[in-house]
Amino acid sequence: MSEAPFNYAVFQRDEWHELVVPAADRDTSHVTPKVLGEIKAFNDQISMSDVADVYDPLVHYIKLRHAQYLRDREERDHFLGRAIKPSPFVIGIAGSVAVGKSTTARLLQYMLQAEYGEQNVALTTTDGFLLPNEELQAQGIFDRKGFPESYDMPALLEFMNNVKDGDEVVRSPRYSHDISDVLVNEFDTFKRPDIFIVEGINTLQAAPNSPVYLSDFFDLSLYVDAETLLIEHWYIDRFEALLQQAKEEADPTNFFFPYTQIPVAEAVAGARRVWETVNLPNLTDYILPTRERADLILHKTMGHGINEIWLRKF
């Protein structure tokens, strides 16, 4: 198991569970097994104990950081003698493919929305800023999909600048995992959210040929972590589940449909090659090195259970 860097305080799950608010006084009744089933990403795992032990204390920590953010803005406005346009509190969530980032992002959005009521908690992913498959193929980098050069980083940075600048309306391109491509002329629209969650493998990376990090726009950053062999297991397990789903649906437009036309063992072998030649190098060379830029790291073990929380000290 990897060790936390010296500038992180490490909390075991049971220690984290007891922070801030006594466990007996917490109310997570709005998060039900049915809600979890709707929130969790395909083939991911999450339990009610995860909500109580990990995510509820995490929400309290986010609320603390959000309150501090608002105080800082108020004091700055007082110092400057003028009010600055409202700007959302932005949370970035990073980590490997198949590690469970989407589930973490959706659950935090749900729990924060319940906490903040009428305030708007929005969520987007960086997937929509991938170059379309046609463009990746034209540039000869389709096999590098997910690597830094496969994203339209100028567009993503402009989007985040508009979000943080408090623009009235911002739009992000939509991505479909069914066809594994950006959807043409389809967008998600956000109207000045109070809290904005941005999830993606590249959220802590620097843009190529740019001095700006995407994380420069974040007020709090999280990294979902696990041992590489575990992530590989989850990746293959998810592929097999998606393969079975594609076989049952028999939809030729589904990205996984062609794999249903060959023997399962051959399809799984192909998925392992993709892991070894694409996802593993991307994790090793570009994603994992950004882990220590995160303010907080959720470390997972078998069954997607979170066993440690690493909190940056400085």
Model-derived segments and spans:
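N-terminal pre-Walker A segment at the start of P-loop NTPase domains
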Residues: 47-81
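Glycine-rich phosphate-binding loop used to anchor ATP phosphates in small-molecule kinases
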Residues: 69-72, 81, 85, 155-216, ...
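Hydrophobic "anchor" residues on beta-strands that sit immediately upstream
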Residues: 123, 195, 221
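Conserved NTP phosphate-binding and transfer environment spanning the P-loop NTPase/kinase superfamily
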Residues: 2-26, 33, 39-48, 203-314
